[in-house]
Amino acid sequence: MTDLTRCLGFRSSAKLARAFAIVAALAAAISGGTADAAATLDHAPYGTTQGGQAVDIFTMTNDHGLRLRFLSYGGVITEIDVPDRAGRVEDIALGLRTLRDYETLPGHFGAITGRYANRIGGAQFTLNGQTYHLIANNGPNTLHGGPNALDHQSWTVSPTQAPDGVAATLSYVSPDGDQNFPGTLTTHVTYTLTNDNALRVDYAVSTDKDTVINFTNHSYFNLAGNGSGSVADQTLLVNADRYTPITPDLIPTGEIAPVEGTPLDFRHMLPIGARLSSAFQQMVYAHGYDHNFVLNKGPGDSLTFAARAYDPRSGRVIDCFTTEPAVQVYTSNGMNGSVVGSSGTTYRQTEGFTLETQHFPDSPNKPNFPTTELKPGQEFHSTTIFRFATDAPLPSLPR
């Protein structure tokens, strides 16, 4: 594929694959095909890990032709193909070029992150009177579960029935002591690409020993298209009156503070880059946005509107709904041009943004934060939905 890619003048195999898909769609139309087709789930070999495990790539396509691709390695979402207001399709998920890149490069691109997403301060926590010393992989802290966490594992993938689209369930059993966390953790994550053009992510997690957990998906979005440049002019709304302030090493202080009067106030649509260079101390600490927003939730764990992102140029919209209490907005501050993405371009700060639905960072060390403890006999359930559209009305904001 590499030689053919160069011969035809494409910058990457992903670009060439999308070109072939467009040609196939045109051929279907010429032969009398229609725009809508039955939802499908296909898979093909993708490569072999450094540890010798075979990895497959899965392609989900809904009735309207919306397409998502993911790997059995880390559950990595490599591609989300979404039309703009004129019907032009672009991949809006940042990705990497090869399996080896996903194994070795930083950034957690598109991956399922756990056993504990985000940071645990000092790489330790105390549970039931016992202190667990984790593996520090972010300065003195533990980030996204450790250096060899669930985003670096091969998951079992099974097709799943979905009345409203196409679905697959990814399963992994993390042994007791994995990355020094207690308990054998059984995790099932179901990706559903619905026929109303949404990606639904459902988590189901159980343990055989008291432990702590936090799960999210670490996809970077660029609504103008992967490799199109900065998202600074794309607009964002976050349904949050409060956030959790951080220390210089990005650990929550334990305070829950109002966003009003700060650059973290996204309660109305605002360009992501409008206040990115603010001298506000929180922005200086994170070199941009890397903050946990406390969502304005309804009663209980109800699925509520969390955030909207919009690209005025293309008209593409993502609306995010979740049962989680918070969302981490991250503006890819760690990207410095050293990583070449699947688009063939180098990734830099503001090349993409994340909407990482989650419990609060460092909750095991902050008793005033919502608990992340999980006990035997309990099953943790969480749902996040990313709905894709163009120029759509804003959902109502629950209070």
Model-derived regions: residue spans:
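N-terminal secretory signal peptides that target proteins for export/translocation
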Residues: 1-15
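Compositionally biased regions
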Residues: 13-14, 32, 397
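Bacterial N-terminal signal peptides
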Residues: 19-31
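Sec/Tat signal peptide C-region and signal peptidase I cleavage site
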Residues: 33-37
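An exposed, glycine/acidic-rich loop-and-rim segment of catalytic or binding clefts
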Residues: 38-399
